[in-house]
């Protein structure tokens, strides 16, 4: 739930997410609000999906595809879910490990809110949900945050963000004075 798999290269199934079972009895897997982008895996004669999300069950009852639930995801090829987002997720700086979503990303406010029940914060500890719906991936975009900079007596620059007691970021605080 709410994860990103990026630029993985494997010899087995699914560079992003891969599911294989010799006996699928009782197995259930759910992929929801995730981004799988730029992953590769070997070509094989069995399996369903693509290099980013792939599942197969050689020598089983053929039920593995029925036991893997793919909810809202962002993948380059729409072969795993009718609701898949296939546009570039627009990471801030994937080359340097920043997988936060940039402004204009199709993954912002595109997730399945019920899937995150019980998970109130993102990987940075910021409140989920910010906006119309949960974002895909591990980071929630907090657009338009109220950020101020101030110079202290020592000449240091301080960044200030405002939050409610519930941890919700305030985008337009109406406060003044020294604290």
List the predicted regions and their residue ranges.
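Short loop/turn microsegments at loop-to-beta-strand junctions
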Residues: 115-117, 157-159, 177
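Residue-level detector of functionally pivotal "anchor" positions at catalytic/ligand-binding pockets or at interdomain
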Residues: 81, 140-166
């Amino acid at each position: 739930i709410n994860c990103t798999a990026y630029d993985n290269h494997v010899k087995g199934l699914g560079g992003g997410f891969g599911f294989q079972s010799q006996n699928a009895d009782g197995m259930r897997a759910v992929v929801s609000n995730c981004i799988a982008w730029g992953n590769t895996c070997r070509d094989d004669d069995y399996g369903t999906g693509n290099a980013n999300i792939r599942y197969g069950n050689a020598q089983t009852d053929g039920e593995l595809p029925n036991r893997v639930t793919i909810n809202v995801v962002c993948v380059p090829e729409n072969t795993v879910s009718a609701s898949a987002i296939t546009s570039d997720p627009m990471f801030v700086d994937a080359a340097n490990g920043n997988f936060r979503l940039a402004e204009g990303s199709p993954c912002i406010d595109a997730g399945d809110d019920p899937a995150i029940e019980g998970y109130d914060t993102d990987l940075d500890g910021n409140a989920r949900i910010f906006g119309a719906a949960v974002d895909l991936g591990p980071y929630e975009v907090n657009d338009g945050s109220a950020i101020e900079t101030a110079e202290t007596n020592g000449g240091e620059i301080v960044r200030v963000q405002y939050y409610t007691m519930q941890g919700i970021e305030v985008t337009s605080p109406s406060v003044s004075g020294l604290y």
